[in-house]
C-alpha cells in the first residue's frame, strides 16, 4: 500500500492507472478462525487482521486505566474478541504508528457507550451531541454531564490532533455533523424508516473518517460525499450486522429500562412491524444486510476508475471494515458472552403493538403563542361593549417573552467557539461541583457574555457578528438594548439559585470591573486617545478577563472541595491571550474577515495592541492619526484607508510584535495550566484541548 504522501500526491489524479491496493500491514485470516454466520458471502469479503495487534491492545489498556480513573469501573467487555481486537479486524491497514491511538480511542468509546446504555434512553440520546461538543470544545449545558467523560473525550481529541491535525480535523467535523443529525430513540413504522435512522445513529460516517485517519488518508467530509452512496450502503450493512449479534443484550436492557419505547434494533423492528418470529426476523436481517453488502461491491466497481486514488484506497478499506466488523461482532466478548448465557433461541419480546399514530391535541384552555394557558372566556369578557374600552378585569392576556428573547436567541444561534463553557467543564474536573451548579454557572456566564456582545455591537456600530448581520441590524437598536437589560435579569435570577452566599458579592465585584474596563475602551475610541500598552493590558484584565475571573470565583465558592490554589495567573494570562489573539486575527485572519468584515477594528476605531504599538513606533504617526480622525468623521474607513493603515503597521513591525506577544502569552497560559495540573495531581485535557483549538503556530 502506498504511504500517506503517496495518497495525497495521487489524490489530484482523475485517471486511475495504479494497481489495486497492496496490503502491507495485515494478513488474511484462516477460514477455520471465523464464522460469517450467513453474512458477507461474496468471496471478496475476506477478513484480515493487523500484524501489530499488540499495539491496539496496548491502547485499550491505556484507555481502560484512564476511564477507570476518571469515570469509574465498568466490567462489561469491550474491544476484544476470540478472533482479535476490533481495530486489528476493522482497520487492518491502519498505519502501525497509529494503531495504539486507534485502540485507545475505540476502547474509550466502547467504555462510555456502556455507561450510556445503562442509563435511560433520554440520557443516551443526549450523549452523542455532548461528546461532539467535548471534542470541539463547544458549549454544553446538560445537567447530566459526566466530568470524567469530558476529560476522556478531550484527551482523545488532543491525541488525534498531535498525530495528524488535518485528518483529526476531518474526524471532528464528521463527528459534529453526525451529532447535529442525531435523533432521539422512537418507535418505527417500517424497517426502511428504521434503517435510515440507524445509519445516522450508528455513527458509521465517523467510523469511516476514523479509518481514514488510521490509514493516513486526508479525505475531507466534502470529498467523502463523492462516494456517499457506497458509504451509506456500508453503514447499513454494518448496522444490520451489529443488530443481529447485539439483539439479546439490547433486549435485556430494553426490559430493564422503565422509559423504553422500543429497541433500536432491526430484529425488534421486523418482529414488531411485520409480525415475524425472532428466528424469522434474524433471517430477514441477513437478507437485508446482503443487499447492502452486494451494493457496496457493485458500486465500488463502477466508480473506481472515476475517483481519486485516495478515495479508491478508502473504498478498499471500507470493504475490509464491513467484513472485519462482522467477524468481530460474531466472536466478541461484548456480545458472544452474553449469547452464551441465553440458551434459548427465542426470547420473550416485549412488544407493545404497532406505533400509535399521533392524535390531534385536545385543548381545554386557550393556548398563547408563548405556551402559557388561559382559562376559556366566560360570558363576561371584561369589555364594555357600549364604548369599546377594555376594563381591568384580571382576564387580560399574559404577554410572553418571545419579543424580548428574539435578539438573544438569534445571537446564540450563531456559531461559537464555546471557549468559556469548555473552561468551566475543565475546571470542574478539579473542583467537582454538583451538576446543577455547573449548569447554573454556565447560564450566568452565557447570559452575561451574550449581553456584552449585543451591547458591544451597538456601541461599536458593528454590522456583522460571526459572519451574519448583528442583532441590532435586524431587530433595531432599541429592542436590542432592551434585550440586553433582560439578559442581566436572567443572569441574576439564575445566580440566586446558587448555594453559596458569596455568589452575589462575586457577581457584583466582577461585573463592576467589566463595566469599568469597557468604559475605558469606549472613551479611548471616542476621544481619539491612545492608551499605553500597560493601560491596555489593565483594561483587558478588567473587561475580557472579568468573565473568566467571575466563572472561576463562582466555581470555587460552589465547590465542595477546599481550594487554596491560586488561579489568578491562569485567568489573567487567558484573558490577555484571548483578547490580543483576537486583535491579531481581526487584522490578519481570512476567517475573521469572513465573520466580522475586513479589519473591522479599524472601522470601529478601536485601539487594539497592533494600533497602539504602531502609533508609538511608526515614522508615519501623523498619517495614521489622520486616518483615525477621518474614520470618526466618516463613520468608518474605506478599503484603501484600511490597506494604508495595515501597511503602516507592517512597516512599524506592529503585526509581528503582536504575534510575538500572542506566542508569549500562549506559552504563559500553558505554563500556568501546568502549575495547576501539578498542584491538583491531574492533567486537565479539556482545558488543554480548548487551548489547542486556539493555538497559533510559531
From Swiss-Prot:
A motif (NSE/DTE) lies at residues 242-250. GO terms for biological process: alcohol biosynthetic process; isoprenoid biosynthetic process; mycotoxin biosynthetic process. Mg(2+) 1 binds at residue 113. Signal peptide: none annotated. It holds the Pfam family polyprenyl_synt. The keyword Lyase applies. GO terms for molecular function: lyase activity; metal ion binding; prenyltransferase activity. It catalyses: 5 isopentenyl diphosphate + dimethylallyl diphosphate = all-trans-hexaprenyl diphosphate + 5 diphosphate; all-trans-hexaprenyl diphosphate = macrophomene + diphosphate. Its EC number is 4.2.3.221, 2.5.1.158. Mg(2+) 4 binds at residues 456, 460. A motif (DDXXD 2) lies at residues 456-460. In the N-terminal section; belongs to the terpene synthase family. Hexamer. The conserved DDXXD motifs as well as the NSE/DTE motif are important for the catalytic activity, presumably through binding to Mg(2+). This is Macrophomene synthase.
Amino acid at each position: 500500500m502506498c504511504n500517506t504522501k503517496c495518497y495525497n500526491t495521487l489524490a489530484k489524479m482523475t485517471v486511475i492507472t495504479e494497481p489495486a491496493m497492496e496490503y502491507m500491514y495485515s494478513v488474511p485470516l484462516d477460514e477455520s478462525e471465523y464464522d460469517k454466520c450467513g453474512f458477507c458471502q461474496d468471496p471478496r469479503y475476506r477478513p484480515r487482521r493487523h500484524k501489530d495487534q499488540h499495539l491496539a491492545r496496548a491502547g485499550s489498556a491505556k484507555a481502560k486505566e484512564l476511564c477507570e480513573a476518571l469515570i469509574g469501573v465498568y466490567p462489561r467487555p469491550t474491544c476484544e474478541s476470540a478472533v482479535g481486537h476490533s481495530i486489528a479486524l476493522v482497520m487492518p491497514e491502519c498505519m502501525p504508528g497509529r494503531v495504539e491511538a486507534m485502540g485507545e480511542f475505540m476502547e474509550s468509546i466502547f467504555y462510555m457507550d456502556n455507561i450510556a446504555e445503562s442509563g435511560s434512553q433520554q440520557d443516551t440520546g443526549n450523549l452523542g451531541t455532548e461528546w461532539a461538543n467535548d471534542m470541539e470544545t463547544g458549549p454544553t449545558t446538560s445537567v447530566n454531564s459526566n466530568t470524567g467523560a469530558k476529560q476522556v473525550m478531550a484527551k482523545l481529541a488532543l491525541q488525534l490532533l498531535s498525530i495528524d491535525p488535518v485528518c483529526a480535523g476531518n474526524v471532528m467535523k464528521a463527528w459534529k455533523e453526525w451529532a447535529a443529525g442525531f435523533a432521539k430513540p422512537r418507535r418505527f413504522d417500517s424497517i426502511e424508516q428504521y434503517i435510515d435512522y440507524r445509519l445516522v445513529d450508528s455513527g458509521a460516517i465517523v467510523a469511516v473518517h476514523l479509518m481514514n485517519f488510521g490509514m493516513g488518508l486526508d479525505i475531507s467530509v466534502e470529498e467523502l460525499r463523492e462516494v456517499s452512496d457506497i458509504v451509506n450502503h456500508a453503514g447499513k450493512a454494518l448496522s444490520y450486522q451489529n443488530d443481529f449479534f447485539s439483539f439479546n443484550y439490547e433486549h435485556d436492557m430494553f426490559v430493564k429500562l422503565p422509559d423504553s419505547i422500543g429497541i433500536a434494533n432491526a430484529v425488534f423492528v421486523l418482529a414488531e412491524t411485520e409480525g415475524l418470529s425472532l428466528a424469522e426476523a434474524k433471517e430477514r436481517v441477513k437478507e437485508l444486510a446482503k443487499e447492502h453488502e452486494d451494493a457496496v461491491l457493485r458500486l465500488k466497481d463502477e466508480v473506481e476508475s472515476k475517483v481519486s486514488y485516495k478515495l479508491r484506497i478508502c473504498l478498499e478499506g471500507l470493504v475490509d471494515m464491513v467484513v472485519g466488523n462482522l467477524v468481530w461482532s460474531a466472536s466478541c466478548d461484548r456480545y458472544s458472552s452474553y449469547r452464551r448465557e441465553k440458551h434459548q433461541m427465542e426470547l420473550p419480546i416485549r412488544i407493545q403493538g404497532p406505533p400509535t399514530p399521533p392524535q390531534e391535541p385536545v385543548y381545554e384552555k386557550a393556548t398563547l403563542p408563548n405556551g402559557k394557558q388561559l382559562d376559556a372566556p366566560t360570558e363576561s369578557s371584561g369589555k364594555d361593549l357600549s364604548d369599546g374600552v377594555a376594563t381591568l378585569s384580571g382576564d387580560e392576556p399574559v404577554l410572553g417573552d418571545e419579543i424580548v428573547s428574539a435578539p438573544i436567541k438569534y445571537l446564540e444561534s450563531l456559531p461559537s467557539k464555546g471557549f468559556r463553557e469548555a473552561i468551566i467543564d475543565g475546571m470542574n474536573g478539579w473542583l467537582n461541583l454538583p451538576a446543577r451548579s455547573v449548569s447554573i454557572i454556565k447560564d450566568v456566564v452565557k447570559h452575561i457574555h451574550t449581553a456584552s456582545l449585543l451591547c458591544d455591537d451597538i456601541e461599536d456600530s458593528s454590522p456583522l457578528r460571526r459572519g451574519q448581520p448583528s442583532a441590532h441590524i435586524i431587530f433595531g437598536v432599541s429592542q436590542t438594548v432592551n434585550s440586553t437589560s433582560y439578559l442581566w435579569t436572567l443572569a441574576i435570577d439564575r445566580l440566586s439559585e446558587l448555594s453559596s452566599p458569596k455568589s452575589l458579592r462575586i457577581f457584583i465585584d466582577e461585573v463592576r470591573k467589566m463595566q469599568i474596563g469597557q468604559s475605558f475602551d469606549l472613551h479611548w475610541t471616542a476621544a481619539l486617545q491612545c492608551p499605553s500598552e500597560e493601560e491596555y493590558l489593565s483594561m483587558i484584565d478588567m473587561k475580557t478577563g472579568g468573565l473568566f475571573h467571575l466563572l472561576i470565583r463562582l466555581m470555587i465558592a460552589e465547590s465542595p472541595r477546599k481550594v487554596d490554589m491560586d488561579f489568578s495567573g491562569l485567568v489573567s494570562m487567558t484573558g490577555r491571550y484571548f483578547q490580543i489573539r483576537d486583535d491579531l486575527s481581526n487584522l490578519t485572519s481570512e476567517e475573521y474577515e469572513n465573520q466580522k468584515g475586513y479589519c473591522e477594528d479599524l472601522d470601529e476605531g478601536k485601539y487594539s495592541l497592533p494600533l497602539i504599538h504602531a502609533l508609538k513606533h511608526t515614522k508615519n504617526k501623523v498619517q495614521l492619526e489622520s486616518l483615525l480622525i477621518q474614520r470618526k468623521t466618516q463613520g468608518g474607513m474605506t478599503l484603501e484607508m484600511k490597506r494604508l493603515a495595515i501597511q503602516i503597521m507592517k512597516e512599524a513591525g506592529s503585526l509581528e510584535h503582536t504575534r510575538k506577544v500572542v506566542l508569549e502569552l500562549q506559552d504563559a497560559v500553558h505554563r500556568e495550566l501546568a502549575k495547576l495540573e501539578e498542584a491538583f495531581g491531574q492533567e486537565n485535557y479539556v482545558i488543554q484541548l480548548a487551548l489547542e483549538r486556539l493555538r497559533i503556530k510559531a
